[in-house]
Curated annotation (Swiss-Prot):
Required co-factors: Mg(2+)
Residues that coordinate or bind ATP: K149, Q155, G156, Q218, R219, Y220, V221, K231, F232, D233, T276, N277
MF (Gene Ontology): ATP binding; metal ion binding; protein-glutamic acid ligase activity, elongating; tubulin-glutamic acid ligase activity
Domain characteristics, as noted in the entry: Gln-155 is the main determinant for regioselectivity, which segregates between initiases and elongases in all tubulin--tyrosine ligase family. A glutamine residue at this position is found in elongases TTLL6, TTLL9, TTLL11, TTLL13, TTLL10 and favors glutamate-chain elongation, whereas an arginine residue is found in initiases TTLL2, TTLL4, TTLL5, TTLL3, TTLL8 and favors initiation.
Binding site for L-glutamate: R257, K294, K379
Organism this protein belongs to: Mus musculus
Gene3D superfamilies: ATP-grasp fold, A domain (3.30.1490.20), ATP-grasp fold, B domain (3.30.470.20)
Protein name: Probable tubulin polyglutamylase TTLL9
Function noted in UniProt: Probable tubulin polyglutamylase that generates side chains of glutamate on the gamma-carboxyl group of specific glutamate residues within the C-terminal tail of target proteins. Similar to TTLL1, may acquire enzymatic activity only in complex with other proteins as it is most likely lacking domains important for autonomous activity. Mediates tubulin polyglutamylation which induces establishment of microtubule heterogeneity in sperm flagella, thereby playing a role in normal motile flagella axoneme structure and sperm flagella beating pattern.
Biased composition annotated in UniProt, kind: Polar residues: 1-10
Biological processes per GO annotation: flagellated sperm motility; protein modification process
Length: 461
C-alpha cells in the first residue's frame, strides 16, 4: 500500500518478498474516466479503491504526481504510472535540450558518425530565452516556414506557423512583461544539489518567475510524406519499466493520424491542413469519423511496402527504433529512477518525402480516450498488455522478450530477435527485437505465455 511519509506506518507483518505473493486482490486507483477505467475494472483480481493511501497500483495524472509523490511512502510492490521528472523528455524544450546535450556527448565520446544518429529532430530554439539565436538562424534561411509551440500544452493548443520575422516580433511584444494566462503549471526541473539529493521544488515556486509562457520555435518540415494528398503523423507507444538499467518495450500497434484537408504551404494559417491532432481535426466542419482520419500502423506499413518495397520500409522502421532508444538514453542520467515507477509514452513521429522519420514530441499522458470502435480496441489491448508487463500479479519470470503486443527492445542493451546471447561485435546478423506495424497475434501469444508459466510453476524443482 501507499501512505503519507509522516504516518510512521511500519507496513505489513510478513516479509516483503512474500507480501506480494500473498496478495489476493490488487487495489487500484485512478481518476481517468476513459478506456483505462474499463480495463482496470474488468481485470480479474483487481478492485477499485477511493481512499488515498490504500492502493497498490495508481494510474495518476501528472498534477497529482507533482503535489504528492515526494510525500508518499510506497511499499515494495506498489506501482505508479509516471516517473517523478518525466517532463525531462515530455516537455518540448527539455526534450530538445537533453537531445542536444546527448548529441554533444556522443560526438565527444564516439565521434561524429554516432552523434549523427541523433539528427532526428528539426532545428529548435526555446523562446524567449533563445530569441536572438533564433533571429540569427532565421536570417540565414529567409522564406522557410517555422512553427511555434507552447512547451507545456497539448492537443494543438497555442500552435501557429509563420514565415516573417515580424510575426515573431509581434508575438514577442504581445507577451513581453505579461503574466501568462490559462497556462499549464510549469514543472520544476529536478536538479542534483551538492548533498546528492534532488531539488524538487514545486512548479508553483517557479511560476511567478516566468515573465512569459515558454514556447519553442521549430523549423517546419515542409516536405511531409503525403497519402491521398494529406499530411499525417504516427502515434507510437513505448513502455519504460526502468531507466537504470534502461528497460524499454515497444508496442506493435499504433496509428497514423491524418489531417482533414489536403496539404498545401499556401495557407499556413489553416490548422486543419498542418495539425494532425484529433482534438484539432474533429472541430473541422466537414470532419467525419468514418472518413478515415486514422490508419492502424499495420495498414500503414503494408501501404509503404507496396509503394517502396520491404527494404525501404525496414530501413524506415529501424530509423524509428533509433529515435526511441536515443531519446530515452538522452534522459537516462537525469530521470529520477524509482523502482515503483513505469511510464507509457506516446511518441509523435513525422515522415518526410525521403522516408526520414522526425521526432515531433513525446507525451507522458497519451490520450486513452477512444475516437472510434477500432481505436477503443487498440487502446484496450494496449492497456491490458501494459498491465501484463507491469505484472502486479508476479507471474512473469523477467526473462520474457514478448508479452502480448509488447516486444522488449532494450534491456541495458539492444535485444535480439533470436534467442541466446547477442553478438554485437560486428552487428552483422543482429536484428533488433522490434515488430512495429507487424501482425499482433497478442491473444494467442498471451495464451501460450501464461500456459507455459503455469507449467513451470507446477513442475517439481
Amino acid at each position: 500500500m501507499s501512505r503519507q511519509k509522516n504516518q510512521n506506518s511500519k507496513g505489513h507483518g510478513v516479509s516483503k518478498g512474500k507480501e506480494r505473493e500473498q496478495r489476493t486482490l490488487i487495489r487500484f486507483k485512478t481518476t481517468l474516466m476513459n478506456t483505462l477505467m474499463d480495463v482496470l475494472r474488468h481485470r480479474p483480481g483487481w478492485v477499485e479503491v477511493k481512499d488515498e493511501g490504500e492502493w497498490d497500483f495508481y494510474w495518476c495524472d501528472v498534477s497529482w504526481l507533482r503535489e504528492n509523490f515526494d510525500h508518499t511512502y510506497m511499499d515494495e510492490h506498489v506501482r505508479i504510472s509516471h516517473f517523478r521528472n518525466h517532463y525531462e523528455l515530455t516537455r518540448k524544450n527539455y526534450m530538445v535540450k537533453n537531445l542536444k546535450r546527448f548529441r554533444k556527448y556522443l560526438e565527444r565520446e564516439s565521434g561524429k558518425t554516432e552523434a549523427a544518429k541523433c539528427d532526428f529532430f528539426p532545428k529548435t530554439f526555446e523562446m524567449p530565452c533563445e530569441y536572438h539565436l533564433f533571429v540569427e538562424e532565421f536570417r540565414k534561411n529567409p522564406g522557410i516556414t517555422w512553427i511555434m509551440k507552447p512547451v507545456a500544452r497539448s492537443q494543438g493548443k497555442g500552435i501557429f506557423l509563420f514565415r516573417r520575422l515580424k510575426d515573431i516580433m509581434d508575438w514577442r511584444k504581445g507577451t513581453s512583461g505579461k503574466k501568462p494566462t490559462g497556462v499549464e503549471t510549469q514543472p520544476a526541473r529536478a536538479n542534483m544539489n551538492p548533498s546528492g539529493s534532488h531539488d524538487t521544488r514545486s512548479s508553483d515556486d517557479q511560476k511567478d518567475d516566468l515573465p512569459v509562457e515558454n514556447y519553442v520555435a521549430q523549423r517546419y518540415v515542409e516536405n511531409p510524406y503525403l497519402i491521398g494528398g494529406r499530411k499525417f503523423d504516427l502515434r507510437v507507444y513505448v513502455l519504460v519499466m526502468s531507466y537504470i538499467p534502461l528497460r524499454a518495450w515497444l508496442y506493435r500497434d499504433g496509428f497514423a493520424r491524418f489531417s482533414n484537408t489536403r496539404f498545401t504551404l499556401n495557407s499556413i494559417d489553416d490548422h486543419y491542413v498542418h495539425l494532425t491532432n484529433v482534438a484539432v481535426q474533429k472541430t473541422s466542419p466537414d470532419y467525419h469519423l468514418k472518413k478515415g482520419c486514422k490508419w492502424m500502423l499495420q495498414r500503414f506499413r503494408q501501404y509503404l511496402a507496396s509503394k517502396h518495397g520491404p527494404k525501404a520500409v525496414e530501413t524506415l522502421f529501424s530509423d524509428m527504433d533509433n529515435i526511441f532508444i536515443k531519446s530515452l538514453q538522452s534522459v537516462q542520467k537525469v530521470i529520477i529512477s524509482d523502482k515503483h515507477c513505469f511510464e507509457l509514452y506516446g511518441y509523435d513521429i513525422l515522415i518526410d518525402q525521403d522516408l526520414k522519420p522526425w521526432l515531433l514530441e513525446v507525451n507522458a499522458s497519451p490520450s486513452l480516450t477512444a475516437s472510434s470502435q477500432e481505436d477503443y480496441e487498440l487502446k484496450t489491448c494496449l492497456l491490458e498488455d501494459t498491465l501484463h508487463v507491469v505484472d502486479m500479479e508476479a507471474r512473469l519470470t523477467g526473462k520474457e522478450k514478448r508479452v502480448g503486443g509488447f516486444d522488449l527492445m532494450w534491456n541495458d542493451g539492444p535485444v535480439s530477435r533470436e534467442d541466446g546471447p547477442s553478438d554485437l561485435s560486428g552487428m552483422g546478423n543482429f536484428v533488433t527485437n522490434t515488430h512495429l506495424g507487424c501482425v499482433n497475434d497478442r491473444k494467442e501469444q498471451l495464451r501460450q505465455l501464461f500456459r507455459s508459466l503455469q507449467a513451470q510453476r507446477k513442475a517439481p524443482s
